[in-house]
């Protein structure tokens, strides 16, 4: 059975994170993975090229050697394992999973807040503190998204949860109740 890219990303990311914790190097590995993510964003399609069966193995090896030369230890070995299993096209999902686990480990929750108008720094800080308390995290960082179509209120998305306090949703609920 072929695994989808999300399952592959979760498995490899989890394994790398557990190894990082065991070796007491979670922060260093995280920083190296951020560098790797940057390389992948600067060279779109790099993972697909390294996973392409039409490319000669020695050609891929040249590219791979250049890529791993910037990394040491665990990350270098991890890249070699991922390459040997022909999974370089799923590397960004592995990095995402590692980052999610790393943030959980640090007590940090990343999310977004959608509002009709921009929030002041003070409002955003209060909202982040409330979300941290509600979702039981030490720290929350919310990225602001302005969307006037929600009319008012806020929609917070974090950790696969949505807290919808928008006026638009409240009006839709009222309309549905009146139409019954």
Curated annotation (Swiss-Prot):
Q: Which domain of life is it from?
A: Bacteria
The record ties this protein, via Pfam families, to: OSCP
* Main location, first listed in the record: membrane
Per UniProt, the keywords (alphabetical) are: ATP synthesis, Cell membrane, CF(1), Hydrogen ion transport, Ion transport, Membrane, Transport
State the compartments where it is located. Answer: Cell membrane
Annotated membrane topology is: Peripheral membrane protein
Q: Cross-referenced Gene3D superfamilies, in alphabetical order?
A: N-terminal domain of the delta subunit of the F1F0-ATP synthase
GO MF, one example: proton-transporting ATP synthase activity, rotational mechanism
Keyword Transport set for record: yes
Record GO cellular component, one term: plasma membrane
Tell me the protein family, please. Belongs to the ATPase delta chain family.
* Entry function: F(1)F(0) ATP synthase produces ATP from ADP in the presence of a proton or sodium gradient. F-type ATPases consist of two structural domains, F(1) containing the extramembraneous catalytic core and F(0) containing the membrane proton channel, linked together by a central stalk and a peripheral stalk. During catalysis, ATP synthesis in the catalytic domain of F(1) is coupled via a rotary mechanism of the central stalk subunits to proton translocation.
Under the subunit heading, UniProt states:
F-type ATPases have 2 components, F(1) - the catalytic core - and F(0) - the membrane proton channel. F(1) has five subunits: alpha(3), beta(3), gamma(1), delta(1), epsilon(1). F(0) has three main subunits: a(1), b(2) and c(10-14). The alpha and beta chains form an alternating ring which encloses part of the gamma chain. F(1) is attached to F(0) by a central stalk formed by the gamma and epsilon chains, while a peripheral stalk is formed by the delta and b chains.
Official protein name in the record? ATP synthase subunit delta
Species in which this protein is naturally found: Enterococcus hirae (strain ATCC 9790 / DSM 20160 / JCM 8729 / LMG 6399 / NBRC 3181 / NCIMB 6459 / NCDO 1258 / NCTC 12367 / WDCM 00089 / R)
The top of its lineage is: Bacteria, Bacillati, Bacillota, Bacilli, Lactobacillales
């Amino acid at each position: 059975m072929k695994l989808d890219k999300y399952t592959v990303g979760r498995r490899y990311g989890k394994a790398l994170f557990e190894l990082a914790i065991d070796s007491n190097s979670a922060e260093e590995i995280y920083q190296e993975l951020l560098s790797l993510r940057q390389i992948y964003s600067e060279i779109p399609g790099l993972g697909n090229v390294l996973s392409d069966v039409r490319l000669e193995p020695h050609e891929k090896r040249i590219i791979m050697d250049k890529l791993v030369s910037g990394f040491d230890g665990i990350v270098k070995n991890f890249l070699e394992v991922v390459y040997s299993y022909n999974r370089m096209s799923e590397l960004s999902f592995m990095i995402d999973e590692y980052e999610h686990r790393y943030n959980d480990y640090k007590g940090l929750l990343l999310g977004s807040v959608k509002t009709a108008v921009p929030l002041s720094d003070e409002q955003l800080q209060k909202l982040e503190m409330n979300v941290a308390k509600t979702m039981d995290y030490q720290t929350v960082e919310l990225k602001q998204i302005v969307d006037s179509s929600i009319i008012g209120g806020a929609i917070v998305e974090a950790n696969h949860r949505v807290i919808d306090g928008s006026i638009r949703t409240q009006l839709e609920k009222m309309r549905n109740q009146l139409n019954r």
